[in-house]
A protein has these predicted regions:
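Exposed, low-structure sequence patches enriched in small/polar residues
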Residues: 122, 282-307, 328-636
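N-terminal periplasmic "start-of-domain" segments of outer-membrane beta-barrel proteins
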Residues: 13-67
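Extracytoplasmic beta-strand/coil segments of soluble accessory domains associated
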Residues: 36-49, 73-115
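Short acidic/polar hinge/loop motifs at secondary-structure boundaries
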Residues: 114-141
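N-terminal periplasmic accessory domains that precede
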Residues: 46, 72-75, 95-98, 127, ...
Length: 636
């Protein structure tokens, strides 16, 4: 897919608004000359840190304009190639990532630095979040991830809300279409309706039949944002995201299918089960940055959801389970506070905490989760004039039934003008989710990272290694009836295990506008849940003519054989597979994006050779597919 040459740091600049050029002139009356100009919003509002995080991967809304994407996981896959995609083969389902040998439950998602999670499952459906709602996205790993977030020894993703600062009405429309009757649209309207005030409204609608039986979805959401900036140093926002997200949960294909490529004859494990969530996420956030050395920000939030699991009688779990439609209601209310202080030219301190009340009802698939939890952290960063930087921190969380501790330290040091060394060591706990069983002990993760960087990020080489040791890992097995129907999972604490691996990526400009990269991931140990080798190569050429541009390129990747773990939809847990997943390549993809004025057309012809590949066992990736999307912004 499309390449991003380094983490971008783009945002709505002051030049985007007519307020930036309003200046009093000599013949202006005194009353007008002394009038207060409208304030600009704090550009770092909603970020984990109001100041620079050196080891943070970041991309912004201007970056994703160049990408052929349909959902948030499409963007993450193109911007963070060190993650292994745990894709379910289509759109709208629980597509996630394995980072440094972890799994989807080791990743944490935040919006404006407040947590987004489904309490029953202990994780979040990434593609539930509309990409058009983001301004910038931070991806943290290692020490920074486990200190600033919970259950995040894989990665911590924080999404900053979109910042629109326009005097005239701003409108952006997005439309997408693909095979298997995929149709999607998105709209955004925003305007400064009074000095220092902005209102934003958006919607998103998607539908998809799916390649295989019971793998489609039907999704829509609406969103609203209100911003008040009384000064250039202070910003308050109120946002609401309502989601209605329904999808077929077929559990992957049956292992004994003779042909995994024929959507007519390939039989799914579960033919009569679908899930739908109705969810509200309301966030009141504030940021205050009085000077270049101090910042305070926080948020109060509410999230409520109703999960519906609609099942045929063949998937009832026992004689007491007689309702076809099972509903589980969850809610959590909380507050987050973060303080940052520059102690000296070389020392920064960050501290904060959160307080949360959660209530998630019990069901045939999940334990009850109810009560108050609290967390606090401290993070210090030190940078010398020689370019050496140190970061360390600790986080403690007290839940209803356990205490979790996370801590770590990291160093970055230049070896020469073109070579830099990084190392990171962290220790963290992951609490079990209600669907795993709250009576289980927490997992304990030890993660060591080491890397070398040669040259700049846009045209250099990155090589890194990791080692992850997991004590009391939470493992799951499939529960079936006498007919082989999947009824759910049973989780338990397994034997300690370790996984080691590496990642290497090289980027270069072959010519002035011809950009190429190759990359590879490697994994060993840990029960062979991940392939020994996963790698690829891609290239793109960009042509510019005034304000218009054309980008075209290709990408191809492949994996070696591995056993892996497959996904069980009733509990969102992974179980060991019966068979080995064969080595495969992704069939090669070609893509192009064209910009003409404020309109942008994107097209991807993926899997040209209709190759069969499974990133999650028994969930084949899409075959030859044409994806087209068009966006058009007015008064941008």
């Amino acid at each position: 897919m499309l390449l991003v040459a380094g983490g971008a740091d783009l945002y709505s600049a002051a030049s985007d608004t007519l307020y930036a050029v309003q200046k009093p002139v000599a013949d202006t009356p005194d009353s007008a000359r002394n009038a207060k100009l409208p304030s600009l919003p704090v550009k770092s509002h909603g970020l984990i840190s109001q100041f620079t995080m050196p080891e943070c991967v970041m991309f912004g809304k201007r970056d994703i304009e160049k990408m052929p994407y349909f959902e948030l996981t499409d963007i993450l896959r193109q911007t963070f190639p060190a993650a292994f995609p745990q894709s379910l083969g289509g759109f709208g389902g629980f597509n996630s990532f394995s980072v440094f040998g972890g799994n989807a439950h080791d990743n944490s998602l935040r919006f404006n630095a407040r947590p987004l999670v489904s309490p029953m499952f202990g994780t979040f459906l990434l593609d539930q979040f509309p990409p058009e709602m983001l301004e910038r996205t931070e991806i943290l790993t290692g020490t920074d991830a486990v200190v600033f977030g919970d259950n995040s020894s894989g990665m911590l993703i924080n999404i900053q809300e979109a910042i629109h600062d326009v005097k005239k009405p701003y409108t952006r429309l997005w439309y997408a279409q693909s095979d298997y009757n995929f149709i999607a649209s998105d709209g955004v309207f925003s305007q400064n309706f009074a000095p220092d005030w902005n209102g934003t409204f958006g919607f998103r609608r998607q539908s998809y039949d799916g390649r295989f039986n019971n793998s489609g979805f039907d999704i829509w959401n609406v969103r609203f944002g209100l911003r008040f900036s009384p000064s250039d140093k202070t910003t308050f926002t109120l946002t609401e995201l309502f989601t209605n997200h329904g999808f077929g949960a077929n559990g992957g294909l049956m292992p004994d299918n003779t042909d995994f490529t024929n959507p007519i004859t390939a039989l799914p494990r579960i033919s009569d089960l679908d899930e739908r969530v109705f969810r509200h996420d309301i966030t009141l956030a504030g940021s205050w940055r009085p000077d270049s050395g101090f910042a305070a920000n926080g948020s109060a939030y509410f999230s409520g959801e109703n999960w519906e699991i609609n099942r045929g009688s063949a998937y009832f779990t026992g004689v007491a389970d007689t309702l076809r439609l099972m509903q589980t209601r969850s809610a959590f209310v909380g507050a987050v506070l973060r303080l940052e202080q520059k102690i000296s030219d070389i020392l920064f301190l960050r501290a904060g905490g959160d307080l949360t009340w959660v209530n998630s009802a019990a069901s045939v698939y999940a334990d009850v989760l109810s009560g108050v939890s609290a967390a606090g952290y401290i993070h210090a960063s030190w940078a010398s004039s020689a370019g050496i930087s140190l970061r360390s921190g600790a986080r403690i969380r007290i839940d209803q039934d356990r205490t979790s501790l996370s801590l770590g330290a990291a160093v970055a040091a230049p070896i020469s003008s073109q070579i830099a060394f990084t190392a990171d060591f962290s220790r963290s706990d992951r609490a079990p989710s209600p669907t795993e069983g709250r009576n289980l002990p927490s997992e304990k993760h030890l993660l060591a990272l080491a890397g070398l960087r040669f040259g700049p990020d846009s045209s250099g080489i990155i090589a890194s290694m990791f080692s992850r040791y997991i004590s009391s890992p939470i493992e799951s097995i499939r529960i079936t009836d006498t007919n082989g129907n999947t009824l759910g999972t049973h989780s338990f604490s397994g034997d300690s295990r370790a996984v080691v691996g590496g990642f290497i990526r090289g980027r270069t400009f072959l010519f002035k506008r011809l950009f190429a990269q190759c990359w590879a991931q490697s994994y060993f140990g840990g029960g062979a849940e991940l392939p020994a080798l996963f790698g690829g190569i891609s290239a793109q050429y960009e042509y510019k003519a005034g304000a218009s541009s054309l980008i075209a390129g290709f990408s191809v990747s492949g994996i070696t054989a591995y056993r892996g773990e497959t996904f069980v939809p009733q509990t969102w847990n992974y179980v060991a597979t019966e068979n080995e997943t064969p080595a495969a390549f992704d069939g090669c993809s070609v893509f192009a994006t064209a910009k003409l004025g404020n309109a942008r057309l994107r097209a991807v012809y993926s899997n040209l050779f209709s190759a069969h590949i499974e990133y999650t066992p028994y969930y084949p990736d899409l075959d030859r597919t044409l994806r087209i999307s068009l966006s058009w912004a007015f008064n941008d």
